[in-house]
Amino acid sequence: SVPKNKIFKTLNSSGTSGKKKSKIFLDSNNARNQQLVLSKILKTIIGNKRLPMLIIDKNPKNIYKSEISAKLAAINGFSIFGREHSYLLNEKGEIDYLNLNIFLEKYGNTNFLIFGFTSTVYENLFSKINLKNLKNNFSNGILIHGGGWKKMESIKVSNAEYKKKLFNKVKLKNIYNYYGLVEQTGSIFIECQYCNDLTTSIFSEVIIRDKYLNVATSGQKGFIQVMSLLPSSYPGHSILTEDIGEIINKNSCVCSKYSTRFKIHGRLPESEIRGCSNI
């Protein structure tokens, strides 16, 4: 691990069970590599230019600390790929229509980036938003969202229904789900826009293991094991999660990505509900 005098940033684990959270210590080199790889992955969606960015959350500037939670780490990590940042929610957690309309009037007619956690986006852009208070829609938005699927499962909303509901409500059509752990920040698995499967990159891989921890066959559900080349200041190269998924065996997709494709089916029953949206 990294010497104490080389610690650049400390992250709290998003997946640790129990009262005492595991901590991930990053040196400057590891943090930089994570940012570079995340940039390469996101460029396939948003291009090379930073876009105006709407964050579906409260402004976290007053609660940033040296020890950053998974949620704040994700907001920080994605924010560097946007500009002219605006936050949907005020300090009370309510939709700030004044701020939202200023953003949409200025940037709504061109491509803009939206980031948020799955359930928070759904709660605010579908359940709570009042269209009568809007002066523009989200048709030019590019939404990247992750985490919070446990909450969506509890209200019986699938990934396909999620996309359909957001389009019908606010005309948001460019929607990308991602899967990732704070323990492997940068090595996210982004959803293919054509087949809607999650995909690996050249920096990461996924293995599915059965209940005996043997490698599962294609199409067989099991525990998700995530692997990344990025960790250099902490032992996070291979992590066996409590998430359940399966490898999707597809010979081809119009995106032409050569990668492992997989789906998430939720978390192991009775495991502790933890993740970015729960912190």
Q: Where are the language model's segments positioned?
A:
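A broad structural signal for alpha-helix termini and local helix breaks/kinks
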Residues: 17, 46, 169-171
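Active-site glycine/GP-rich loop and adjacent strand/helix microenvironment
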Residues: 76-279
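Active-site diphosphate/adenylate-binding microenvironment
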Residues: 1-12, 18-24, 40-45, 62-64
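Conserved AMP-binding loop of ANL adenylate-forming enzymes
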Residues: 39-76
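Short secondary-structure capping/junction motifs at helix and strand boundaries
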Residues: 20-25, 43-54, 81-88
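A short, flexible beta-alpha/helix-coil linker loop
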Residues: 19, 60, 148-151
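Conserved ATP-dependent adenylate/AMP-binding module captured primarily in the ANL superfamily
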Residues: 34-51, 98-106
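"Short basic amphipathic alpha-helical interaction patches in structured regions
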Residues: 9, 23-32, 68-71, 129
